[in-house]
């Protein structure tokens, strides 16, 4: 199975790439919007790259209202990546997404 890493592909900006995958994984979403970390977010090292974006995202309500319907139109299985700071936040997100027929799987970040 070939899929993207969460946050590495905007399927709405590159739909042909997303459609070529076996499944598309969304950028991680949290219960509330997050601005993420201040720059510098990415550093190159001899061993590779390090990143610490800080889970910047618009929150679950925005994902459900704005992005999820458009992502479902791509016709590729949709995995939603969720993040939280407590087990209850993960449970809340999973419960909301479990009721959505367009969501094929949930990734815990």
Where are these regions (language model features)?
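N-terminal capping/small domains of soluble enzymes
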Residues: 1-77, 83-85
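Alpha/beta enzyme core
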Residues: 73, 87-109
